[in-house]
């Protein structure tokens, strides 16, 4: 982002909750505090849990809502691709912001999240990208404290933009389930890990006596490790986690290379015999 000042930045806003989601409206307001050049390209319908998927078996349909706002019948990754490669192809975005998600995206959530996937897509396309999510508690998603993200996000984004971060890295921001005055701080964290025994499959019966199922997570109080995104949200802090696109575990790669020994050594291709004239 070489442009001086945020007001000259071209910002792309997207999400996974859909074009009519309240969190998208909040993020639009935040983006307009940072720049005059804000574009919105978001899914026509909710795409929560779509992860980093692309629509390869179906065509993308694009609906223009206003001069700078589009709905795409596709995934969050589709939306970013459509924006960068088509809608804004003549002058690409300087920044992608995705969210604000209804619910936290921390720990293992990052592998499922369409919100984070949109930021991943932006990162893959060489554009600095940030995912933002607002946690909600046991009272349910009807009581999401959007004011917390709206209050803190503008200054956080300005400082992140000024500082910059490496290519192949995206920024994942999560706001705790408290009102702005009850936030206890801001912490740069590492990705935590959930207890996968909390994943549940709930069976129900429809009107024709056929079973159907819902996937979900049990919500319990826990004591996550210090320094993790889980702990920060648990203690009412804003969590900022840099996520790296390269998922290779280098220590294991070296150990496997040592274990395989000569099998892991590349073989030289034999030279082809020169033709006789």
UniProtKB/Swiss-Prot annotation:
Broad enzyme group: hydrolase
Hydrolase recorded as keyword: yes
Compartments (UniProt record): Cytoplasm
UniProt-recorded Gene Ontology molecular function terms: 3'-nucleotidase activity; 5'-nucleotidase activity; exopolyphosphatase activity; metal ion binding; nucleotide binding
Reaction catalyzed: a ribonucleoside 5'-phosphate + H2O = a ribonucleoside + phosphate
Pfam families tied to this protein: SurE
EC number: 3.1.3.5
InterPro entries xref list: SurE, SurE-like_Pase/nucleotidase, SurE-like_sf
GO cellular component, one term: cytoplasm
Cofactor(s) of this protein: a divalent metal cation
Keyword check for Iron-sulfur: no
Annotated binding of a divalent metal cation, by residue: 16-17, 48, 101
Keywords: Cytoplasm, Hydrolase, Metal-binding, Nucleotide-binding
Cofactor remark from the record: Binds 1 divalent metal cation per subunit.
Purpose of the protein: Nucleotidase that shows phosphatase activity on nucleoside 5'-monophosphates.
Homology family: Belongs to the SurE nucleotidase family.
Protein name per Swiss-Prot or TrEMBL: 5'-nucleotidase SurE
Classification lineage: Bacteria, Pseudomonadati, Pseudomonadota, Alphaproteobacteria, Hyphomicrobiales
């Amino acid at each position: 982002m070489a442009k001086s000042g945020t007001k000259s930045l071209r910002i792309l806003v997207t999400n996974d909750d859909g074009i009519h989601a309240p969190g998208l409206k909040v993020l639009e307001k935040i983006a307009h505090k940072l720049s005059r050049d804000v574009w919105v390209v978001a899914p026509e319908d909710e795409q929560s849990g779509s992860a980093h998927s692309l629509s390869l078996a179906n065509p993308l349909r694009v609906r223009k809502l206003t001069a700078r706002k589009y709905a795409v019948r596709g995934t969050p990754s589709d939306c970013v691709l459509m924006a960068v490669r088509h809608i804004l192809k003549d002058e690409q975005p300087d920044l992608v912001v995705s969210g604000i998600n209804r619910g936290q995206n921390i720990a293992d959530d990052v592998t499922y999240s369409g919100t984070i996937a949109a930021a991943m897509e932006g990162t893959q396309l060489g554009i600095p990208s940030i995912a933002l999510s607002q946690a909600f508690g046991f009272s349910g998603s009807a009581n999401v404290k959007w004011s917390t993200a709206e209050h803190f996000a503008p200054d956080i984004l300005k400082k992140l933009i000024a500082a910059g971060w490496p290519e192949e890295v995206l920024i994942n921001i999560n706001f705790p389930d408290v009102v702005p005055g009850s936030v206890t701080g801001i912490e740069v964290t590492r990705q935590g890990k959930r207890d996968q025994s909390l994943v549940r499959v709930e069976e129900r019966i429809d009107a024709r006596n056929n079973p159907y199922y819902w996937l979900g997570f049990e919500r319990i109080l826990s004591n996550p490790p210090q320094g993790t995104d889980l702990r920060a949200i648990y203690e009412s802090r804003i969590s900022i986690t840099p996520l790296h696109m390269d998922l290779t575990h280098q220590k294991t790669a070296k150990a496997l290379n040592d274990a395989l020994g000569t099998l892991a050594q590349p073989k030289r291709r034999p030279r082809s015999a020169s033709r006789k004239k």
